[in-house]
Amino acid sequence: MKISYHGHSVVRIETNGKTILIDPFITGNTTTDLNAADVKADVILLTHGHGDHVGDTVEIAKRNNALVVATFELATYLSWQGVETFGMNIGGAREFDFGTVKFTQAFHSSGFVTEDKQIIYLGMPTGILFTAEGKTIYHAGDTGLFSDMKLIGERHSIDVAFLPIGDSFTMGPEDAAVAAEWLGAKLVVPIHYNTFPPIAQDPQQFVSLLPPGVGRALQPGESIEL
């Protein structure tokens, strides 16, 4: 399994002959190394409906005939735009040919702001547990610290956890360090920082809060192999 980070909250997983993208916010992402027009994907997983996470989903999904897996409301909304979707919800797991997807809770919000000043509710925000080849990846999405992260860590052996550290809209570094401890992940990678001024952070400072060897700040385009 190959896992790549592409700035903000964009993660790519290559496994079982498939390419899976999580939260493909590319156009307008000042930290990414990707060009949306060149991105290939078989599957897109979405944590919630904010624009900096849904991003280029519709364009990428249509061009690649990719399946989009998201919460029921978000999946329904995207299906109306001609995208193939599979709707799920928090606590539910589904085994696909590319791996198993399970949605966890997240403490945040989820909605799309339209140009005519309307907000479309798009279900609950989530985290994602993705399991394939005997490895489990946890992408927390956007969230504050919550005590059930302990339960997630108890119920699942997490190989890599992607945790937001930007503060303002999500956990900051200190709370994310507590989350890392509760989750017990073998490797913790910071996400959702430095894209916009309100979420400016030093990822190495976050890494320094973790036990030696647990934290690793990936550069956009950098990969790890499991």
Curated annotation (Swiss-Prot):
GO MF terms here are: hydrolase activity
A Pfam family (short name) is: Lactamase_B_3
Q: Which SMART domains match?
A: Lactamase_B (SM00849)
Keywords in alphabetical order: Hydrolase
InterPro entries to which the protein is assigned, alphabetical = Metallo-B-lactamas, RibonucZ/Hydroxyglut_hydro, UPF0173, UPF0173_UPF0282_UlaG_hydrolase
What HAMAP family has UniProt attached to this entry?
A: UPF0173
Q: Which family does it belong to?
A: Belongs to the UPF0173 family.
Q: What is this protein called?
A: UPF0173 metal-dependent hydrolase GTNG_2675
